Amino acid sequence: MATRDYYEVLEISRTADDGEIKKSYRRLAMRYHPDRNPDDASAEERFKEISAAYEVLSDPQKRQAYDRFGHAGVNGGGGGPGAGFGGGGGGFGDVFSDLFEQAFGGGFRGQDSGRGADLRYELELTLEEAALGKEVTIQIPSSATCEVCRGSGAKPGSAVEDCATCGGRGQVRMVQGFFSVTRPCPQCNGSGKVIKEPCTNCHGHGRVRRNRDLQVKVPAGVDTGDRIRLNGEGEAGERGGPAGDLYIQVRVLPHALFERDGDDLHCAVPVQFTTMAMGGELEVPTLTGRAKVQIAPGTQSGAVFRLRGKGIKGVRSKLNGDLHCQLQVEVPVHLSARQKELLEEFAREGGDNIQHPQQESWWNKAKDFFDRMGL
């Protein structure tokens, strides 16, 4: 199946700024999140498609490559947030390197060919963990420098000779027509050395596979789509080359009480109709405990109370957002005979003496409508 345009996937224009991209991603990710759509394979695929589009369009370099070359410009970049671990790289440089591979029959990566690959890890957090920050331990399956040969790839004590093909330079020059290109030596893979006796532990690669535990400090205020970069924590480099980086993609799980909008939180609070009518004190939940709000007599259903500073601390601004509590009248069910009797008495006693501002406003609007329609 053909890959859809990433701007179409996120339902944004090609001129959308970073804020619009992030806002649309949050909205769509919340709608198609697998936790909200259990047993719905199409929603899961849509969520993966949305995540892949956001990974490209939220990165300025990847977006530039995508805008110019389409999907071909970003095909080397690995999976989206749902891909777990994956190799990094890709982007603008790969487009041109592919041209050289076609012309000269090999890769062109320059002198940095021994650098380890980047890794990606998807980290799931609860809303509380994302809001307050947390130190987590993650297990990374990756390659590490061989402890026996210390990354050289050679058996300890054995001789390592200069490569005869490149004369120990690690590079060869290839000429075709008007083009002259320097590329890593295919004989020694750019190292300039030839191993006569490979290390028995790593078989000459200088790296071994292992799982390692890594402590990660997640800053307070992160949100779905945010990315944490840890320099040098990716794959080990080949034969002593520099290690790649580790990119931790954050995904915040849906919450039972709160919905997040940037640094603000929204919460629906059920309230008894007697409290709304007569007023009183109400306890509402916050991320750090309980808070009390005063309900004025006659408060209408749908009223919103804003608790300043009870939202989430911005990861960059360091300012706390607000908590918006929307009051919703809860109509009682399964009334006893006595309760029904009291309500009937209340209705009889009310008559025209009790004011219902929303009802009166609605009927006035309805009357105007009927008059205009001649009904």
Swiss-Prot record:
Zinc finger (CR-type): 133-211
SMART domains the UniProt entry points to: DnaJ
Binding residues annotated for Zn(2+) 2, in chain numbering: 163, 166, 185, 188
Entry keyword Cytoplasm: yes
The CXXCXGXG motif repeat ranges on this chain: 146-153, 163-170, 185-192, 199-206
CDD domains: DnaJ (cd06257), DnaJ_C (cd10747), DnaJ_zf (cd10719)
Residues that coordinate or bind Zn(2+) 1: 146, 149, 199, 202
SUPFAM superfamilies according to UniProt: Chaperone J-domain, DnaJ/Hsp40 cysteine-rich domain, HSP40/DnaJ peptide-binding domain
Subcellular location: Cytoplasm
GO molecular function: ATP binding; heat shock protein binding; unfolded protein binding; zinc ion binding
Domain J: residue ranges: 5-70
Coiled coil: none
InterPro entries for this protein: DnaJ (IPR012724), DnaJ_C (IPR002939), DnaJ_domain (IPR001623), DnaJ_domain_CS (IPR018253), HSP40/DnaJ_pept-bd (IPR008971), HSP_DnaJ_Cys-rich_dom (IPR001305), HSP_DnaJ_Cys-rich_dom_sf (IPR036410), J_dom_sf (IPR036869)
PROSITE patterns: DNAJ_1, DNAJ_2, ZF_CR
Record's signal peptide: none
Pfam families: DnaJ, DnaJ_C, DnaJ_CXXCXGXG
Main subcellular location of this protein, as a coarse class: cytoplasm
UniProt cofactor note: Binds 2 Zn(2+) ions per monomer.
GO cellular component: cytoplasm
Cofactor list: Zn(2+)
Example GO biological process: protein refolding
Family: Belongs to the DnaJ family.
HAMAP family per the UniProt record, alphabetical: DnaJ
Record's subunit section: Homodimer.
Entry remark concerning the domains of this protein: The J domain is necessary and sufficient to stimulate DnaK ATPase activity. Zinc center 1 plays an important role in the autonomous, DnaK-independent chaperone activity of DnaJ. Zinc center 2 is essential for interaction with DnaK and for DnaJ activity.
Name of the protein described by the UniProt record: Chaperone protein DnaJ
Source organism (scientific name): Acidithiobacillus ferrooxidans (strain ATCC 23270 / DSM 14882 / CIP 104768 / NCIMB 8455) (Ferrobacillus ferrooxidans (strain ATCC 23270))
Phylogenetic placement of the source organism: Bacteria, Pseudomonadati, Pseudomonadota, Acidithiobacillia, Acidithiobacillales
